[in-house]
Structure formats: structure tokens, C-alpha cells
């Protein structure tokens, strides 16, 4: 509950937005100014005492009814916006999930951000030809909207304006529109055909991402740039002509367009960001003098960057000397590649560079490489051993995730950071030494490494992230150095062979489910430094019978020791100190 005092004269935009537990509000008569819509995504009861506004039939207007601030009827199926309304405010109809149809009068010139966001039953709406722009998120989540006529007055379509309009089948973008925002039609999975008008100059990032039914697309020769992921996952798109007007193509622009047979990079293109063609296996042709395309490999002009390798049949490849960067997803899903030679000129291996190269078994990373990107070797299931050179300072998230044959890896002293999920699912990895240069182990780094029986954790480490060693079922003993201050949620959950662990005096908190289902753990001494033990921290530790909890511990969450078979005297002592909630 909240009472707006009579001293208040102005209420700001979104002031009570998303206050889901607030049952009611009264706008006092002192309020003379309301900015935007203070009440979006709030469904409570509203009352207005101010003479500066009109509140009738659960709709809040300004005094002359030129501005519709908030529509609050959650049950109505249709609504006619009164003639004379000029502006529909930000999120005015948000989450009105019962509304099926709305009539917009010709007086309306402005529709605010997210005006109809979440109107999931809305199937019919006519936009008047006085509206000049469709703002960001205007129809976001209007999943029942089947068709829409965008009038010639509209000059721009905002970011994510029609995101998730999964029933929208067809659309004509009029000649008046000059820009299509990021994610404008993201997830419009029923959209089958589209004509981009002659006036559009830019197609935003992810503009048509996930339009999986889109078969026909015409891009006009007014377009100069195609954004990142603009047509990503348009899996039914069969043909596309990039016009000669385009000078720039974004990263992942045609990613996962699995039905697209061919593409031609026109001579007008001078800039390619990242890899526009990742997860696409069609035929590529390049007419641009700004790039080199030879033997099914796309490079930049001076061949310092390998953008895309497109030979799906080759079993081996030698990257030319002089290449400095292996681009994002450059070799993605090259299932036939068994070996690859990387020259000493390479300094960077990009995100997902060898993702899905399931036959790759022979690889040497040269001393010139300083970083291994996110998911760089994700799913390289035949890779058995790897030496990471002393030049590498960072290993990205998911870098070796799913490398299930990787049994031996050497991590150098130069390494300072290991990203989340970096070795997740490396089920053959037996032992590992983490160097002193590493200060933290992120979430899920060694999750699912079920053969990992021996690991050395350095004194430099200060934190062990959530799920860091979850499911390492062969890990039998572990010494946590006294530099560590926190053990994250589920950090050692499912380590069924872990029978001996020493928690140092530096640790102050043990996270939720940190040692859940460590069924071999028989004894444990919690140090004086620990003040709290998380929810279910030792749940399912069925062999744990000997436990020492110091007086420093003042909070033990529910179920912390559920399923632990303590002797009766120890169990009663713990119940006396912390209550029976810790066992249920």
C-alpha cells in the first residue's frame, strides 16, 4: 500500500511501474503534472481526484483528452479510442491480454514506446495515416496480430516494435519508412513474405531474426547497411539478392539461414563485421575488391583476418602465415576437419571459431595467441589433448565445453581468467592444475567433468563460483586454499566421490546446495570464519555423520542438512541451536 500525499504536484514516468503487489493508488487533487505514464505494468485499482486529469471508464486522460495516459480495463475485449486523442502514451495498454481489437482515430499522431506491449489477444488494429512513427516495443508480444497495414505517413519502425508477433503473416513496408530498428520483427515466426521499400536505408541488428517462415524477401537498392543478425535463423529463406547499394554487412546477418542456397557479396561492400555467414553452408561468391575469396575461404583484403572457411569436405587445412585473427565462427560445424595448422602470426582465436568441429583431433595453438574466445572449441568432441601456450591470458566462456574426449590439457601460468562453462562437459578430463595467476573460478567452469579425480587449486584463488565443480563425480578429495572467501551455490553438488574436504578459515559463506548429494562425505569441520550456511548446502550427504559447526555461524537456511544421517545426539543439538527447519 502507498498513499500519495497532497503535497505532490508532479508524478514521473514509470513512478509506480511494475509494482505488482500494490493494490490501489489515489492521485490527489494537488497533482497538476503527470509525465508519460507512471503506472505501466501495474494492474491495481486507480482513483483520480485531480481536476487536471480525466479518469473515466478505467481510462486516464489529460484534461483536454488529447493524451491517453493509461488504459486500465483488464477485462474488455475491444476499445474505441475517442476522437481528439493526439498521443497514446508509453505502455498505455501494456499487458491488456483480453483486448482483441482497438480502433485508433485519425487524430492520433504519436504512439509511445510499448503502447500495446503484451496485448497477446490483439488481432486487429488500424493505424491511422496521421501517425509518423511506430515506436520501440509498440506491438511487442502481440502474438495474435495476424495482419497490419503500416500507413504511408510512418517514417520509422522502432527497435523491437513487432517482436514476438508470431501470428503476423504478411507485411508491406511503405515507401515512407527510412529505417527499420533493431529486432523490429524478431520472432515473427509466421511472416512469409516481405518487401523492403525503396526508401529504407538501414536494416537494424536482428531486425528479422527468427522469422523462420520467411521465404521471400526483396531488399531495395536504397539499403546501405544490413545489421548484425538481421536475418539470423530465417530458416525458410531460399533466395536473397544483396543490392549494390549495400556497403556494410553485420556479424551473423545471415546466420543459420539453412535453406538459403547462395549469396553474392556485391562490389559495393567495403565493411564486413565479424562473420555474417556463421552456421550457413550455402554457396558464397564475392565480387568486392575489399575482400579475398579463394578456395572457399573468405579473408579481408590483406589476409590478416580469416572471416569464413566454407569447405565442408576438407579433412585438413593450413591457415596461411600472416593471418592474425581467426574470426567468429570461422570454421563452425566443419564436421570433416580432422587437423588444422595455425601459424605463429595468429594472436586471437574468435568466439566459436571451431564450434562443432566434431572430428578435429589434431591442433597446436602457437605461442603468439593471447586469447581464446567464447565457445572457441565448443563441441570438438574428438579433441583428446591440448597445450595452451604461455602467451594466453584468457579463456572465454564455453571455450572447451562439450570436448568429451579431452583427457589432458595444460594451462599456463600466464592465464588470469577462465570464463564460465569453459570446460563444462569435458567428461574425459582426469586431472588439472590451475596456475597461481588465476584468482577466481567462474560458474559451471568444470561442471560435468565426471572423470576429474585430481585438481590443484592455487593460493591465488579468492572465490569458487556457482556450479563450478557440479557433477564431478570422480573427485575424491580437495584442498581449498585459505585465500578463498566464498563457495558459490551448488559449487560441489553431485560430487559423489568427495570424501574429504578442508574448508579454510578464510571462507565466510557456504552457498545454497554447495555440497548437495556429496554422498561419500563422512565428516566436516566448518571453520570459525563462516557466518552463514545456505539453503540445502549439505542436502543428501547421506554419509555425513561427524560435523562441527562453530558459534560464529548465526544463520543456517532451510534443508541445509536434509537427508544427512546424523547420530541422534548431534541431530538434537543442531535442532536446539538452529531449529528443525535445517532438516526439512
List each model region and its residues.
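Structural signature of tandem-repeat unit edges
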Residues: 1-10, 20-33, 43-59, 71-87, ...
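Consensus positions within tandem repeat domains that build extended binding/scaffold surfaces
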Residues: 12-17, 36-37, 90-92, 112-117, ...
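Short, conserved loop/helix-junction motifs that constitute active-site signature segments
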Residues: 278
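Short acidic-glycine loop/turn motifs at beta-strand connectors
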Residues: 62-65, 300-303
Amino acid at each position: 500500500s502507498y498513499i500519495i500525499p497532497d503535497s505532490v504536484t508532479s508524478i514521473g514516468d514509470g513512478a509506480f511501474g511494475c509494482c505488482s503487489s500494490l493494490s490501489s493508488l489515489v492521485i490527489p487533487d494537488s497533482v497538476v503534472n503527470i509525465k508519460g505514464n507512471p503506472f505501466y505494468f501495474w494492474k491495481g485499482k486507480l482513483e483520480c481526484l485531480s481536476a487536471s486529469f480525466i479518469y473515466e471508464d478505467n481510462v486516464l486522460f489529460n484534461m483536454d483528452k488529447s493524451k491517453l495516459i493509461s488504459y486500465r480495463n483488464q477485462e474488455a475485449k475491444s476499445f474505441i479510442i475517442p476522437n481528439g486523442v493526439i498521443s497514446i502514451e508509453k505502455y498505455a495498454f501494456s499487458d491488456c491480454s483480453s483486448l482483441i481489437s482497438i480502433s485508433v482515430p485519425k487524430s492520433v499522431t504519436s504512439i509511445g514506446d510499448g503502447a500495446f506491449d503484451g496485448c497477446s489477444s490483439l488481432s486487429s488494429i488500424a493505424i491511422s495515416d496521421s501517425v509518423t512513427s511506430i515506436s520501440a516495443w509498440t506491438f511487442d508480444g502481440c502474438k495474435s496480430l495476424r495482419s497490419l497495414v503500416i500507413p504511408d505517413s510512418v517514417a520509422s519502425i522502432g527497435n523491437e516494435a513487432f517482436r514476438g508477433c508470431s501470428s503476423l503473416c504478411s507485411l508491406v513496408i511503405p515507401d515512407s519508412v527510412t529505417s527499420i530498428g533493431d529486432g523490429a520483427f524478431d520472432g515473427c515466426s509466421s511472416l512469409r513474405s516481405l518487401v523492403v521499400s525503396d526508401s529504407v536505408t538501414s536494416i537494424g541488428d536482428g531486425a528479422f531474426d527468427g522469422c523462420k517462415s520467411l521465404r521471400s524477401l526483396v531488399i531495395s537498392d536504397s539499403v546501405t547497411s544490413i545489421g548484425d543478425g538481421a536475418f539470423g535463423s530465417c530458416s525458410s529463406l531460399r533466395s536473397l539478392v544483396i543490392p549494390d547499394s549495400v556497403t556494410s554487412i553485420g556479424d551473423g546477418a545471415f546466420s543459420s539461414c539453412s535453406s538459403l542456397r547462395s549469396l553474392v557479396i556485391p562490389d559495393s561492400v567495403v565493411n564486413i563485421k565479424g562473420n555474417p555467414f556463421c552456421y550457413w553452408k550455402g554457396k558464397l561468391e564475392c565480387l568486392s575488391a575489399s575482400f579475398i575469396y579463394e578456395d572457399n575461404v573468405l579473408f579481408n583484403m590483406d589476409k590478416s583476418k580469416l572471416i569464413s572457411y566454407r569447405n565442408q569436405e576438407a579433412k585438413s587445412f593450413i591457415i596461411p602465415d600472416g593471418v592474425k585473427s581467426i574470426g567468429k565462427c570461422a570454421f563452425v560445424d566443419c564436421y570433416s576437419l580432422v587437423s588444422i595448422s595455425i601459424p605463429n602470426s595468429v594472436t586471437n582465436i574468435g568466439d566459436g571459431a571451431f564450434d562443432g568441429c566434431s572430428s578435429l583431433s589434431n591442433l597446436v595453438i602457437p605461442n603468439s595467441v593471447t586469447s581464446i574466445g567464447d565457445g572457441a572449441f565448443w563441441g570438438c568432441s574428438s579433441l583428446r589433448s591440448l597445450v595452451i601456450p604461455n602467451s594466453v591470458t584468457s579463456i572465454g566462456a564455453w571455450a572447451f565445453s562439450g570436448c568429451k574426449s579431452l583427457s589432458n590439457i595444460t594451462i599456463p601460468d600466464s592465464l588470469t581468467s577462465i570464463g564460465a562453462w569453459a570446460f563444462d562437459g569435458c567428461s574425459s578430463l582426469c586431472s588439472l592444475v590451475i596456475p597461481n595467476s588465476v584468482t577466481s573460478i567462474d560458474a559451471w567452469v568444470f561442471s560435468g567433468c565426471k572423470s576429474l579425480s585430481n585438481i590443484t587449486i592455487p593460493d591465488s584463488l579468492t572465490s569458487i563460483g556457482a556450479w563450478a565443480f557440479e557433477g564431478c563425480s570422480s573427485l575424491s578429495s580437495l584442498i581449498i586454499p585459505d585465500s578463498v572467501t566464498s563457495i558459490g551455490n551448488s559449487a560441489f553438488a553431485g560430487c559423489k566421490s568427495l570424501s574429504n574436504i578442508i574448508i579454510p578459515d578464510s571462507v565466510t559463506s557456504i552457498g545454497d546446495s554447495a555440497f548437495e548429494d556429496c554422498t561419500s562425505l563422512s565428516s566436516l569441520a566448518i571453520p570459525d570464519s563462516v557466518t552463514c550456511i545456505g539453503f540445502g548446502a549439505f542436502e543428501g550427504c547421506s554419509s555425513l555423520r561427524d560435523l562441527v559447526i562453530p558459534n560464529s555461524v548465526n544463520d543456517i537456511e532451510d534443508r541445509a542438512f536434509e537427508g544427512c544421517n546424523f547420530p541422534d545426539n548431534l541431530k538434537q543439538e543442531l535442532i536446539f541451536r538452529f531449529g528443525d527447519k535445517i532438516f526439512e
